[in-house]
Amino acid sequence: MKQSKLLMPTLREVPADAEVKSHQLLLKAGFIRPVSAGTFSYLPMAKRVLNKIEQIIREEMDRIDANEMLVPEILPAELWQKSGRYTTYGPNLYKFKNRQDRDFILGPTHEETFTQLMADDIKSYKKLPLVVYQIQPKFRDENRPRFGLLRTREFIMKDAYSFSADQAGLDTAFRNMESAYTNVFDRIGLNYRAIVGDAGAMGGSDSKEFSAPAAAGEDIIAYSDTTDYAANLEMAKDFYERQKPTFSAEPLEKIDTPNEKTIEELSQLLDVPAEKLAKTIMFMADGELVAVVTTGDFEVNDVKVQNFLQADTLELAEEGQVKALIGASFGSLGPVKLPENVRLLVDERAADLVNFAAGANEDGKHYLNINWQRDVQLTEENIGDFRTAREGDVAVDGHGHLVFTKGIEIGHIFKLGTRYSKAMGAQVLDENGRQVDMIMGSYGIGVSRLLSAIVEQKADDDGLVWPASVAPFDVHIVPVNTKDDEQAGVASQLEELLTKQGLEVLIDDRKERAGVKFADADLIGLPIRITVGKKASEDVVEVKVRASNTNIEMRVSEVVDSVSVLLNGDK
């Protein structure tokens, strides 16, 4: 393709509102343009990359016998009301009415739609297992879109769903999809980790997240420095063995703490380390007030709390609400003498505290020498891991220490079980003639997000660097002087030879200075650049490998074989 015919409006300056490298370079190189906050147009170069990513996905889905199809992006509210997510999904769900005053949504994901389809059309276990998928835009009304394609209101996603008659079928589908995702990301050329993830609004019993380490990542990944353990910080666990301390219980004592509102202040007053103190955080979980107690040196992990409670919604309680019920403000809360309608959860580290201090549920008062069972009844069913892991802690497997890094979520796979099939009535007759709920899995890849993830990992100071497997073109031919007949002839000859080999070629036929052409070539980052310059008369050109920035002079007759080898080495 001739570059003069390509819509690729490059910029010389980086837009001021572009915060991260991928946003800056995709704008500067003419790959994307903003339409509104969180929505973008994908220009021809970006669309070519997306097409190649999608083709890799399709090939890997074909390997596991997944069926590609397409369902509507506009969905009737009744579908989501059946599952309960119409109210629990939260403010990120786009809702609207049509002219007949019927409620609709723009789909952020499609569990309900596919499950209803299966409920209507699949009645026997003999038709299972089935895996279906689609690649289409999704919509999420993000409060604050940012970082270019990393957090948007409209995004392209591949979402897949498996339907099985039993747990073994789900386990097989999950393993197959995990293998397929590994192949996809390997072929794209990304550095990534498969980590323990949170199922979140999707629900389900098990999930695994694929994360690409990058400075622009909004997720924090915790991994062991000596083993394969890795998890999203929301799910990360540190190593802890429950203690059975031998101790002498001291008398419970209430003291005045008029100026001590934080763990740090209380620690200083009592000359006691934070890990020997307890702090209490109040949450509202599905309308129920829940008190969560951890040791003072840890933060409460709300995701772990929500998963433990299996709550649809969890948010920090409002201070006025807490004071009206308990009689104390934040900073003076504790586990002793809580009202009966407040559920108590205690982190396992806090459950092993003895003679510890905590708020007395009176403003300006704290208890000393609290002991479980004597002062607060505590059962094992209310003890768990409710803390956020810290960098440097021993990893949960007891080997190595946790290291934190930022990551971009690029894929996620879930074992949903029967959450949606029960709600949507998706049942089949099993081999014994009994009606059973289909057992489901849900699997997603952020297709448009992959554009940014690739750029974040691969780009250098000069611009984009596309892996050969997804590059918009394979080869960039740059004649230094288009008015020179010999250069133009060699460039045309190379274009023809390379195209016959099945390679996609972009030829810079613009009447621009050589420096401008070279800068643009580095900026758009095609894998191979062939510069046709003064040595064209000698049938010699310069081949540049963009990823390594190495230059090789070679004869025109050597170019086709050499370029093929160089490209295959990058795929």
Swiss-Prot record:
Annotated GO MF terms = aminoacyl-tRNA deacylase activity; ATP binding; catalytic activity, acting on a protein; proline-tRNA ligase activity; transferase activity
Reactions mediated catalytically? tRNA(Pro) + L-proline + ATP = L-prolyl-tRNA(Pro) + AMP + diphosphate
- Name a biological process GO annotation: prolyl-tRNA aminoacylation
Q: Which GO terms describe its cellular component?
A: cytosol
InterPro entries per record? aa-tRNA-synt_IIb, aa-tRNA-synth_II, aa-tRNA-synth_II/BPL/LPL, Anticodon-bd, Anticodon-bd_dom_sf, Pro-tRNA-ligase_IIa, Pro-tRNA-synth_IIa_bac-type, Pro-tRNA-Synthase_IIa_type1
* UniProt keyword Methyltransferase, yes or no: no
Cellular compartment(s):
Cytoplasm
Keywords on this record? Aminoacyl-tRNA synthetase, ATP-binding, Cytoplasm, Ligase, Nucleotide-binding, Protein biosynthesis
The record's EC number reads: 6.1.1.15
**Which family does the entry's similarity section mention?**
Belongs to the class-II aminoacyl-tRNA synthetase family. ProS type 1 subfamily.
Name the NCBIfam families on file.
PRK09194.1, proS_fam_II
* Domains (record comment): Consists of three domains: the N-terminal catalytic domain, the editing domain and the C-terminal anticodon-binding domain.
Report quaternary structure and partners.
Homodimer.
Function summary:
Catalyzes the attachment of proline to tRNA(Pro) in a two-step reaction: proline is first activated by ATP to form Pro-AMP and then transferred to the acceptor end of tRNA(Pro). As ProRS can inadvertently accommodate and process non-cognate amino acids such as alanine and cysteine, to avoid such errors it has two additional distinct editing activities against alanine. One activity is designated as 'pretransfer' editing and involves the tRNA(Pro)-independent hydrolysis of activated Ala-AMP.
Q: What is this protein called?
A: Proline--tRNA ligase
**Organism per entry:** Leuconostoc citreum (strain KM20)
